[in-house]
Design a protein with these regions (language model features):
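Serine-esterase "nucleophile elbow" of acetyl-processing enzymes
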Residues: 39-93, 111-112, 140-147
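A structural motif corresponding to the C-terminal end of an alpha-helix
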Residues: 78-85, 172-189, 224-245
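Structural recognition of the beta-strand scaffold that forms the well-ordered cores
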Residues: 43-48, 52-53, 85-90, 119-124, ...
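Charged, often glycine-rich, active-site loop that binds/positions anionic groups
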Residues: 94-111, 256-270
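Catalytic His-Asp segment of secreted/periplasmic serine-dependent ester chemistry enzymes
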Residues: 196-297
Length: 297
């Protein structure tokens, strides 16, 4: 359901960046007038990977083209809705290590955007760590094409190796990253989002042209995504971070659904330049979940 109109107490002032306001209005949000005696706006740091950056969604943030960051990503929608002062350092292909190390020359570690007086931090992270999840998507897509969509060639070849890598590497790295954020802003509200479903729960033969995953590998890839989200949830619980379950919300809005229903673009014949990533509607829904989970409405 759409975000409710912001109350004046929360909509303290319109974000000064015109792109953020324009993007939010395009997604159906309205900006409330500034109260006569507004208090200081929330100080909001947005961290994370391409799902937070909205890589592939227009318009692109011109300040850092390497990160493929959109000014219509969910952090901008949240900021425009709440009147928060946003520092957006989300970046496509980011891994947990990029919270404390420069991802690209000239791109500071993401945790540098978090300060002791930061009020709000949001992020998605973990999907790119060691290439585990993205490698699984690519591997399963390749195997699906080669098998003509039959069987479970990806599961047969890789078994539990992807899940094992999440347990051994991604999960502890997530805890380290979240602890680093919490240490820098101990009083901030910190929320990490789970990843939305890419595939439906069961194979849909009509979707193979858009998402060439073999019928037996659709539940396999879905199970892997469940495992990744469970790791994110556990890391959140162990670090005092709010976990926002976006997978549950995205049920029925996977990459196999038609335009206007899907929140994730398919591997082929999608409407975004970056496949298997949230579209503008998906980013809007992510913003709604953040607002509701953190009581920002």
């Amino acid at each position: 359901m759409p975000l409710p109109a912001p109350r004046p107490a929360l909509r303290r002032r319109v974000l000064t960046a015109a792109s953020a306001v324009t993007g939010a209005l395009a997604l159906g949000l309205t900006a409330a007038p500034t109260p006569a005696h507004a208090t200081a706006p929330l100080k909001y740091a947005a961290l994370g990977d391409s799902y937070s950056a909205a890589s592939g969604v227009l318009p692109v943030d011109p300040t850092n083209l390497l990160c493929l960051r959109s000014t219509a990503n969910y952090p901008h929608v949240v900021a425009a809705h709440t009147g928060a002062r946003l520092t957006d350092v989300t970046c496509g292909a980011a891994q947990t290590k990029d919270f404390t190390h420069a991802q690209y020359p000239g791109v500071a570690p993401q945790a540098d955007a978090v300060a002791p007086d930061t009020d709000l931090v949001t992020l998605t992270i973990g999907g790119n760590d060691n290439g585990t999840f993205i490698n699984a998507v690519v591997a399963c897509g390749t195997a699906g094409v080669l098998s003509g969509g039959a069987g479970s060639p990806c599961k047969d070849k890789y078994g539990t190796s992807f899940e094992d890598a999440i347990d051994a590497n991604t999960y502890p790295a997530l805890k380290t990253a979240l602890r680093a954020v919490r240490a820098k802003a101990p009083d901030a509200r910190v929320a990490v989002l789970g990843y939305p479903w890419i595939t439906p729960a069961t194979a849909d033969p009509s979707c193979f042209a858009k998402l060439p995953i073999a019928s037996g590998d659709v539940p396999y890839l879905r199970s892997l995504q469940t495992h990744l989200n469970a790791a994110v949830r556990r890391a959140a619980e162990e670090t005092g971070t709010t976990y926002v379950d976006f997978a549950e919300a995205s049920e029925g809005h996977d990459a196999c659904e038609p335009v206007g229903t899907r929140w994730i673009e398919p591997l082929l014949f999608g409407s975004n330049i970056v496949p298997v990533h949230p579209n503008a509607l998906g980013e809007q829904r992510m913003a709604e979940r953040v607002v509701n989970a953190l009581g920002l409405d």
